[in-house]
Amino acid sequence: MQLQLQHGRPADCSGRLEKEIRSYDFLDSLGISYYRLDHEPAMTMEICAAIDESLGGLICKNLLLCNRQCTSFYMLMMPGDKVFKTKDLSAQIGSSRLSFADGKYMEEFLDITPGSLSILGLMNDKENRIQLLIDEDVLKSPFIGCHPCINTSSLRLDKEDVVQKLIPALNHEPIIVQLPTYEA
């Protein structure tokens, strides 16, 4: 798969979804510089590996989680190579019985479909229904990769821009968590 890294938004946004264009508008309004890769839908690990290599940054695994009653929701950003075990996270955030949230909540709260979950979706969560959780290892990388609310493009953002500009503008104060690394 041959991928070409481009700086900023596409020159021609025709044929792109409104939620993708909103992502570029939001980043541009914050003065955040970014690089973009357009690609086929990132649904397999092979595609994700090629994207990771081309972006040259950490692609986050983003999970939408909820408690058993579906009254508390969490978006977890973690390195793609880490294994997620609910027990490792539950105690840190004081929520038992975490599970993966139904895709309908992604669409309802974030205007994102499964496979496209991204920190940029939080710009659509005006009621702050989702608590942002970030594994500490994500913050060790100089760059963070994410989707512009659609999984046919990936962005590389400077970690400092994410921490100092993007997260404050999203109005979602993150909780930093420590997820263990398991041996394969």
Segments predicted by a language model, with ranges:
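Extended, low-hydrophobicity, polar/charged segments
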Residues: M1-A184
